[in-house]
Amino acid sequence: MRMMVAGGGTGGHVFPGIALAEEVVTRHPANDVVFVGTARGLEASVVPAAGFPIELIEVKGLKGKGIAGALLNLLLLPRAFLQSWRILKRWRPDVVVGVGGYASGPVVLTAWAMRIPTAVQEQNAIAGLTNRLLGRVVKAAFTAFPEAARHFAARKVYQLGNPIRRRLMENYMRPESAHGQPRLLVFGGSQGAHALNMRVIEALPHLADLRERIQITHQTGARDREYVEKGYRACGFTPDVREFIDDMSAAYAGCDLVVCRAGATTLAELTVCKKPSILVPFPAAADNHQVKNARSLVDAGAAVMIEERDLTGEVLAREIREILDAPERRERMARAAGRLGSPQAAKEIADVCMELVRRRWGSPFGQAREPGQKPARPPDLAS
C-alpha cells in the first residue's frame, strides 16, 4: 500500500501524520508513505528527518488574512491544484490522508477528483476549516474528541484518538528509572510559548523554598532561551533549559508534572504517557479549540487549566506547589490521564485506511506496481 499524507504547518498536524506513516511502513515491506506539504511548514524539516520523502506545493491560508490577503492567496490555488495533480500522477498513491493545514486541501480534493480513496484526520475538539470542507468528499474522518464528530457525516466518523509517534511509545514502555526529587517539565510546543515562559519566571520567587527539591526541564524556543536561563539563575534554580527538546519520550518519562499548552497532539502524548498537567491554552488558537481540548482532561480529573488571561506567576506557582506536594493527587491525575489515552490510534487508523484501499483496488496492498517502484523526481517540482 502506498499512502500519501497531506498537510502540516505545525507540529500538531505533522506529528500525527508521521506516527501514522510509521505504523503503515512497519506492517509490510512493500508499504510506503510520501508526504505533501509546503516549504514554510514544519513538515519541510521534520518529515525528511523522520525518514520519509516529501513533495512541496505552493499554497497559503485564506482564513484571517483579510480581503486583500485572501484574494492574493486565492490566486495561488490553481497552481497548487496543478502541482497536486502532477504529484498524484507520479506517486500513484492508493489512499490520501489529509492531516489539516493549507497543503491538505488541494491534494485531498485533487485525489478525490481522481477517484483515489481519501480521508482526513482531525486532531482537535473543533475541526479546522480545511478538514470541515474536505469532510464533504472524503470516505472517512478520523477524530480524537467527541465534539469534532458534529462537523462530519456520522457514517464517516471514526473516533480513534490521535496517533502517537512510535519512538515515544517504545521509549515510554521501558521501566522508568527511580528518582527522588519531583521533576517538572515546561514546554510551549515546537516553537516555545513566550507568555508561558514569562509567567514561569515570575512564578520562581513563589517557589524559592523548592529550589533544592525540584528538577526542572524547560523548552523555551529560540527567542526566550537566554532570558529564561538568566531568570532561573537569578532565583537560584539550576534547570535544564533548551530551545527544543528532540527526545520528548525521555522528557515525559522523566517528569512528574507537565506545564504546557493544550494542542491536541500534546494532550494525546500526555494521556498515553499518563502525565498530570497544568494546561495553559493558546488564546489565539482557531475557534478557541485549545480550551475545548483542555476541558476534556480537566473534566476527567487529569489536568488543571489556567486560561492565559488568568495566568500570573503567583497563580502558576500555587498550582505547581499543590500538585507536586501531593503525591496521591498526582497519582490520581496520572490514572485519569491514562484512561483517556489512545495508544492504538495509529494502528486502528491504518486498519481503516487499508480497508478503504481494499474496497477501491480489490486488495489491501493497493494498485499493482513493481516492488519498491518509486517515481523519478522531476528537475523542477514547482513548475
UniProtKB/Swiss-Prot annotation:
Disulfide bonds: none
Pathway as given in its UniProt record: Cell wall biogenesis; peptidoglycan biosynthesis
Residue sites binding UDP-N-acetyl-alpha-D-glucosamine per the record: T10, G11, G12, N124, R165, S190, I245, Q290
Disordered, as annotated region: 364-383
Pfam family, any one: Glyco_tran_28_C
Gene Ontology CC entries for this record: plasma membrane
Catalytic activity: di-trans,octa-cis-undecaprenyl diphospho-N-acetyl-alpha-D-muramoyl-L-alanyl-D-glutamyl-meso-2,6-diaminopimeloyl-D-alanyl-D-alanine + UDP-N-acetyl-alpha-D-glucosamine = di-trans,octa-cis-undecaprenyl diphospho-[N-acetyl-alpha-D-glucosaminyl-(1->4)]-N-acetyl-alpha-D-muramoyl-L-alanyl-D-glutamyl-meso-2,6-diaminopimeloyl-D-alanyl-D-alanine + UDP + H(+)
Keywords tagged on the record: Cell cycle, Cell division, Cell inner membrane, Cell membrane, Cell shape, Cell wall biogenesis/degradation, Glycosyltransferase, Membrane, Peptidoglycan synthesis, Transferase
Cellular localisation: Cell inner membrane
Primary location class: membrane
InterPro entries: GlcNAc_MurG, Glyco_trans_28_C, GlycoTrans_28_N
Membrane topology classification: Peripheral membrane protein
Claim: Membrane is one of the keywords in the record: yes
Family membership: Belongs to the glycosyltransferase 28 family. MurG subfamily.
PANTHER family, A to Z: GLYCOSYLTRANSFERASE, UDP-N-ACETYLGLUCOSAMINE--N-ACETYLMURAMYL-(PENTAPEPTIDE) PYROPHOSPHORYL-UNDECAPRENOL N-ACETYLGLUCOSAMINE TRANSFERASE 1
Protein task: Cell wall formation. Catalyzes the transfer of a GlcNAc subunit on undecaprenyl-pyrophosphoryl-MurNAc-pentapeptide (lipid intermediate I) to form undecaprenyl-pyrophosphoryl-MurNAc-(pentapeptide)GlcNAc (lipid intermediate II).
NCBIfam families (UniProt xref): murG (TIGR01133)
Protein name: UDP-N-acetylglucosamine--N-acetylmuramyl-(pentapeptide) pyrophosphoryl-undecaprenol N-acetylglucosamine transferase
